[in-house]
Design a protein with these regions (language model features):
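S-adenosylmethionine
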Residues: 1-290
């Protein structure tokens, strides 16, 4: 049975090799591995943490690895990123255990029999040198954002405010739930989720939205199974608030996957009218249909 780190590794490798959508692949992999709530949360944190900081992780790893990262097997490249993220950002697992787990995965995943030794050497070097390693000077690498976006932020905001924005953008986002007010009120849902052991807070400026913590696997929550809420980032929900669709409207969601904005529009329209959901990527259309 796969554990959290292997699930995260498989998701990262699929994203790189196949262009898989990280959230959709990870959810499927977590379900297939039957991870409990704690391990599902760890796999999610590891996968998204690596994706969010990949340029910075590669910057550090490239200084420690004699072989250029792009010449490594995809699974080993992502395993190094995974191990580096764990050593630099997480402190729940002792360093020696993190390295040991990475080496075990390398033996299982790599085609090259020497890969396990490489993983062991690079990660142990990172442990020895991490306190002395200087962060990169350029903001793009330090915050793992594309250069064109950093240049745009700096031009508009100045370097200091742009850096603060980049740092905030790399913060761990809260889990934001959009309440399906066609079925339940925000207050009723909050009480139901609290009874299921979820920590709930009202969103400070979005109506009918809740911050959730300690959900474990959402599919196990009765409120989720009954369609009382779905997860949607606040920024995506703002698009629907700005459009302010009314009952009876015909709405076109031209960039719809995975479907959250279309759902929010249907709720705002009180299920009266029509919503046409489109996306240019066929694999994302399947997410909407699901």
């Amino acid at each position: 049975m796969k554990q959290a780190r292997e699930v995260a590794l498989d998701a990262l490798t699929a994203c790189e090799r196949q262009g898989a959508w990280s959230d959709g692949y990870l959810k499927k992999a977590i379900g297939g591995a039957k991870l409990d709530g704690r391990d599902a949360a760890l796999a999610t944190r590891l996968c998204f943490g690596v994706l969010q900081n990949r340029m910075l992780l590669d910057f550090y790893l490239s200084k420690l690895c004699a072989t250029p990262l792009h010449k490594l097997e995809a699974s080993i490249r992502n395993l190094l990123r995974l191990g580096a993220y764990q050593l630099l950002y997480l402190n729940r697992v002792p360093d020696h255990a993190a390295v040991s787990e990475a080496v075990s995965l390398a033996r299982k995943k790599a085609k090259n029999p020497r890969a396990a030794g490489l993983v062991n050497g690079v990660l142990r070097s990172l442990i020895r040198q991490r306190e002395a390693m200087e962060p990169p000077a350029d903001l793009s690498t330090r915050y793992s954002h594309p250069q064109w976006l950093v240049d745009s932020f700096v031009a508009r905001l100045g370097r200091e405010e742009a850096e603060a924005l980049l740092a905030a953008d790399n913060g761990e986002p809260p889990t934001c739930a959009q309440v399906n007010t066609l079925k339940i009120s925000a207050e009723e849902l909050a009480a139901m989720l609290t009874a299921e052991g979820v920590a709930v807070e009202p969103h400070p400026w979005l109506p009918d939205c809740l911050f959730l913590n300690g959900t474990g696997s959402l599919e196990h929550l009765e409120a989720f199974q009954k369609g009382y809420f779905y997860i949607q980032d606040a920024a995506a929900h703002l698009a629907v608030l700005a459009a302010a669709p009314q009952p009876g409207w015909r709405v076109l969601d031209a960039c719809a996957a995975p479907g959250g904005k279309s759902f929010a529009a249907a709720i705002a329209m009180e299920n009266r009218g029509s919503v046409t959901s489109c996306d240019i990527h066929p694999h994302k259309l399947r997410l909407i249909e699901a």
